[in-house]
């Protein structure tokens, strides 16, 4: 999976970049044929934002977290995208189970 970590209008530490790469690595097994993962950090109106984008299997998942610091914003975005991925995984499992019986 291609991984991009970008900071717009701000500087981020190497530790935060590594954390973002770890977060993307956790999600790649959940995405069917994961192609690209991106994390974009930004600062607007005094609030830090983190946006996670995952693409794979013809589906794009996007989640944004907003908080006073980038680490917490990344955690919020991680929670949001995890919910999206869990719903997709459950739907895939539900479809195959119905036709199996």
Describe the residue ranges of each PLM region.
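N-terminal, polar/charged subdomain of small-to-medium soluble alpha/beta proteins
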Residues: 1-101
């Amino acid at each position: 999976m291609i991984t991009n970590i970008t900071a717009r209008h701000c500087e981020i530490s190497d530790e935060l970049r590594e954390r973002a790469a770890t977060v993307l690595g956790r999600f790649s097994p959940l995405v069917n044929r994961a192609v690209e993962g991106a994390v974009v950090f930004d600062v607007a109106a005094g609030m830090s934002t983190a946006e996670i984008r995952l693409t794979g299997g013809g589906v794009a998942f996007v989640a944004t977290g907003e908080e006073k610091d980038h680490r917490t914003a990344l955690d919020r975005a991680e929670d949001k995208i995890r919910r999206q991925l869990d719903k997709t995984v459950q739907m895939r499992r539900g479809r195959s189970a119905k036709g199996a019986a």
